[in-house]
Regions:
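Accessory nucleic acid-recognition modules appended to NTPase machines
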Residues: 215-373
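Hydrophobic anchor at the beta1->P-loop junction of P-loop NTPases
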Residues: 43
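N-terminal pre-Walker A segment at the start of P-loop NTPase domains
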Residues: 1-31
């Protein structure tokens, strides 16, 4: 590779396809962190959530605002087909040495390595650069392996992670130039626009690169993205021998979004479909872990004061974005967006579901920092009939947890009750309100 070829690759890797867009909180935090070369900045998240876009915007800021020479920024996207043959430690080192030949020694050096997980031995390269230079190092990846490898363990606290989610509902509205209501009058003025966009958000999610596409193209983009995640990030990466099992597992999760399930239940379901006869719950468990490593799905455990029950096999699985669950029921779409809101505003390890010995279920239990417990029920259409059932469940939860009780909430999308009265000790809140900043 010549320096001219490298310069062209860097230019193409760092090119912004469009200017503007909303300013995400991650962007501000990343800019602040760029002041000092250490620690290493690691950006993780599902494919197409905006990781590369954040790097590209920082690249432009460094050049256009901070005056950093373009020759001092090595920006490599390892999904570029020109770098497929360079996805090894020796080639990466050679590219780095070539890059250094034109660096301006009076300015800092920046190393941007996008989708680094494809490079065999990348950990040793980054560790060497970190230990021997004052370069600013940024790496991105669509696999949690980045932070579970020996690399992150050996570096200890010398890594600063930015985990990127798809757009929140607030960001989704901002991307369509809809302001966030600050008072009841603004809510009244903007209600129809917010309701329309919320229905879109619930159905198709908030992946930045998909939200502006026509509906038919959204589905095509979704299918292409799922195929890439399943084939490249799981089947190829982990060298799976039975790809049909993984695809059947994905379909199960999509059709049963938010259901309580175990590896054994899922294995039995897939076998009962007829195509796959031999499938162990151990294999299902391993494949579920692979999907979680791609950030595609997340699992929550049952809340219990008994450690054994918390670590039982019975979990609820959700997708990181609703574009991945279009085959689910509308009720499950709503529960999935509420889940994604809750893990943004809470420590994900403190988000659970609740279930008693008679099978009565609370959709979400939040353990707060003061150890108080919030209970949240999600109801797609609130009617006179199901209101009583949802209230009984929340009241039962409050009786079980009197000494630690926090808030009780019933989140709904449509209210079809004949009488819309308030309920003592329980907050009824429309989902579009729940997902926006509270004033």
């Amino acid at each position: 590779m010549t320096y001219s070829e490298l310069a062209n690759i860097i230019h193409e890797s760092a090119r912004l396809d469009h200017e503007g867009g909303i300013i995400r909180s991650y962007e501000t935090r990343l800019e602040k962190a760029s002041i000092t070369p250490k620690p290493i900045k690691v950006i993780t998240g599902i494919r197409r959530s905006g990781k590369s876009y954040l790097l590209k915007k920082l690249y432009r800021k460094l050049i256009d605002t901070d005056g950093i020479s373009v020759s001092n920024i090595l920006f490599l996207n390892f999904e570029d087909d020109r770098l497929i043959q360079q996805q090894n430690l020796t080639s990466l080192r050679n590219i780095y040495e070539l890059f250094l030949t034109a660096v301006n020694s009076t300015q800092p050096v920046y190393i941007f390595l996008d989708e680094i997980q494809y490079v065999s031995g990348w950990e040793r390269f980054v560790r060497t650069i970190y230990d021997s230079t004052l370069h600013h190092i940024y790496i991105t990846g669509s696999n949690s392996h980045l932070l579970s490898s020996e690399f992150s363990t050996s570096l200890g606290g010398r890594i600063l992670e930015f985990h990127i989610f798809p757009f929140s509902f607030a960001e989704f509205l901002q991307s369509f130039q809809i302001k966030i209501p600050q008072n009841p009058f603004e809510w009244a003025e903007l209600r129809s626009s917010i309701t329309f966009r919320f229905e879109q958000y619930v159905k198709f999610g908030g992946l930045p690169e998909i939200i502006n596409l026509p509906e038919s193209e959204k589905l095509n983009a979704r299918n292409s993205l799922i195929e890439k995640i399943i084939v490249r990030d799981v089947i190829n990466r982990f060298k799976l021998r039975y790809p049909t099992i993984l695809k059947s597992l994905y379909l199960y999760l999509e059709l049963h979004t938010g259901d309580i399930a175990s590896s054994k239940n899922i294995a039995n379901y897939i076998k009962n479909q007829g195509e796959i006869k031999n499938l162990s719950d151990k294999t299902v468990k391993i494949y579920l872990e692979y999907l979680e490593k791609t950030f595609l799905v997340m699992a929550i455990k049952k809340f219990s004061y008994k450690t054994k029950e918390i670590f039982s096999e019975q979990k609820k699985y959700y997708f990181v974005d609703n574009i991945f669950s279009v085959l689910a029921d509308p009720e499950d779409w709503l529960e999935n967006v509420v889940f994604n809101h809750l893990i943004r505003v809470n420590d994900p390890s403190n988000v659970y579901y609740g279930r008693d010995e008679r099978g009565r279920e609370v959709d979400f239990v939040i353990r707060n920092s003061d150890q108080r417990l919030d209970a949240i029920q999600v109801c797609y259409k609130l009617t006179d009939d199901n209101l009583d059932r949802e209230i009984r469940t929340l009241k039962l939860f409050s009786e079980y947890n009197k000494d630690r009780l926090g808030k009780l909430e019933l989140v709904y999308q449509f209210d079809e009750r004949s009488r819309k009265s308030e309920i003592a000790d329980i907050t009824l809140i429309e989902a579009s309100h729940k997902l926006l900043p509270q004033n």
